[in-house]
Amino acid sequence: MPKNNTSIHSRSSGSTSSDSIRIPQRGALIVPMTNDYLFRALLQRNNLVLKGLICALLHMEETDISSVIITNPIRLGDSIDNKTFVLDINVILNQHHIINLEMQVINLNNWQDRSLSYLARNFDHLKKGEDYPSTHPVIQIGLLDYTLFPEHPEFYSTYQFLNVKNHTLYSDKLRISVLDLSRIDLATEEDRQYQLDHWAALFKAKTWEELQMLAQNNNYFKEASETVYELTQEEQIRQQCLAREDYNRTMKGIENNFAAQKHEIASLKADLADANQQLSDYQQHIQALEAQLAEYQSKENPSAQ
């Protein structure tokens, strides 16, 4: 099993907020909670928040969790290279389950392949001499700020390998889940039971008022709010978060431009199809007129036949 190599300055799982700083009562957040760098920093800095989020995502009780350990920590505040640096989080749950978490706000149209890559990479961890049954269950969870399948919107969806005919589960060791932060309105009763809708609202929050409201009766959200404030007060971490915001704005512009071009191409194709249909109709009309003319001429000049 991977060793516990979480970074320094991480709050313990038993952390409470009684001795921490007071967060602002109002005003806009310096960095939105959907920022993937802030998301990683929050879960790396505060183990209690990580545990609470996993409880909600896996529909578990806190007492069911003995340990959650991040196995790929980063040095918070260091600059990152978009070509080689990814912000997904690998977690070992109860020394048994491998969980991969990632926040993504820009639809790069690659999430299906990306999530499968994470899933396969984490599952392929057998060492020489180990038996296949020794493999640990792997769960890949994406928190997306867009709808993965617009034709089938769902707030929280889970995918596994099934027999396509009778839906027999092939294995319970591989699973992909997606939390659509943009469709909290579709949360089910079970989602609300485990407060997944509140977690989504936490990550979608834009103001301190929203965080204050969520944190009133929930220690996880109180811890999250205070840790986010603490993180964004640290210059190097804040600068990395803001750099990610600049990157995301650039990518969002590219995404919007791509969508606009895609719409324009579809519109031009539709116009071309209409023009082709009109041309076909004209050709048929001309052929009909030519046939009528030939018939008329044959009647007017029967000797020509």
Q: Which ranges hold each PLM region?
A:
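Amphipathic alpha-helical transducer elements in NTP-driven molecular machines
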Residues: 112, 138, 193-196, 218
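A short, charged helix-loop
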Residues: 152, 157-190, 194-198, 205-206
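Generic recognition of short, well-ordered alpha-helical interface segments
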Residues: 45, 49, 191-194, 219-223, ...
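Accessory alpha/beta interaction modules
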Residues: 1-175
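Short helix-to-loop capping/linker segments positioned immediately adjacent to catalytic or ligand/cofactor-binding
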Residues: 126-131, 167, 185-188, 210-214
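Short hinge/gating elements
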Residues: 35-42, 181-185, 210-211
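Short, charged alpha-helical interaction segments and adjacent helix-coil junctions
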Residues: 2-27, 99-104, 201-305
